[in-house]
């Protein structure tokens, strides 16, 4: 078995006296997709924030590509190849779609540095991945649909050239047609070898798209394993505790 590109060992994270994440452990190999599922308040977002350096862990370890991440500032974690698409579709609403992407390019040093052939992800590649964004390129972030905002948030994350993409609440509030578009894009990204860890409320979709699943309940792991080896009933029992 290959060494996991991301390994989480005994991770505990707290808000005051509340343990939001309790001794969570899992690993994901390069190029795989791992689904993190659980009810609201299960600790999914806190887990992602702890991996990305946005929330300090009380104990445990996070290792990415053989390097420990605990205590590493969030901006350094981005430079090491991890990007987060947070719940809430974080974009600049007052800027156009194209300006949002330009800002991301410049922020990550991809806008004007080095030859184009050295850049794996560019605005043009984002537009190829999400044609709806090209059509809306001049519209403001506040003028586009929720689905387009999610596409834009994913595109901005990709411009940081990540090797691991974390997506919190992939399809929350999106129509079935837009969910299909988003997952087709994620499948294309995954086919190129990118590692995905994502939160999805739709249990069936989580199992169908992922290689592995981790189910959290009140901050603890209630079920983990290969997705195709799990029955829907077992996952739902773990999901609801």
Describe these PLM feature segments.
Residues 140-144:
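Conserved ABC ATPase signature
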Residues 37-39:
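The feature captures the beta-strand-to-loop junction immediately N-terminal to the Walker
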Residues 161:
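Conserved catalytic motifs of ABC-family nucleotide-binding domains
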Residues 16, 57, 72, 97-119, ...:
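ABC-type ATPase nucleotide-binding domains, specifically the catalytic core motifs of the NBD
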Residues 60-69, 80, 114, 118-123, ...:
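Conserved ABC transporter NBD signature motif
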Residues 157-158:
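ABC ATPase C-loop
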Residues 52:
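Helix-to-loop junction immediately C-terminal to a conserved catalytic motif
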């Amino acid at each position: 078995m290959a060494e996991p590109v991301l390994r989480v060992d005994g991770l505990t994270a707290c808000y005051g006296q509340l343990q939001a994440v309790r001794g969570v452990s899992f690993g994901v190999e390069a190029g795989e997709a791992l689904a993190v599922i659980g009810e609201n308040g299960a600790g999914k977002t806190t887990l992602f924030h702890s991996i990305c350096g946005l929330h300090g862990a009380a104990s445990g370890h996070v290792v990415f590509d053989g390097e420990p991440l605990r205590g590493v500032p969030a901006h350094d974690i981005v430079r090491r190849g991890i990007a987060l698409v947070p719940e809430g579709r974080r974009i600049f609403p007052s800027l156009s779609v194209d300006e949002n992407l330009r800002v991301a390019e410049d922020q990550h040093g991809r806008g004007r540095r080095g030859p184009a052939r050295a850049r794996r992800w560019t605005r043009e590649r984002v537009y190829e991945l999400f044609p709806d964004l090209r059509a809306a390129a001049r519209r403001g972030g506040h003028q586009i649909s929720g689905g387009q905002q999610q596409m834009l948030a994913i595109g901005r994350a990709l411009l940081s050239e990540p090797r691991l993409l974390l997506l919190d609440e992939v399809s929350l509030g999106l129509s079935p047609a837009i969910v299909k578009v988003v997952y087709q894009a994620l499948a294309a990204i995954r086919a190129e070898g990118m590692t995905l860890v994502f939160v999805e409320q739709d249990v069936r979709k989580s199992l169908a798209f992922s290689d592995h699943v981790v189910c959290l309940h009140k901050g603890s792991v209630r079920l983990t394993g290969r997705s195709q080896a799990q029955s829907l009933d077992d996952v739902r029992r773990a999901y609801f505790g």
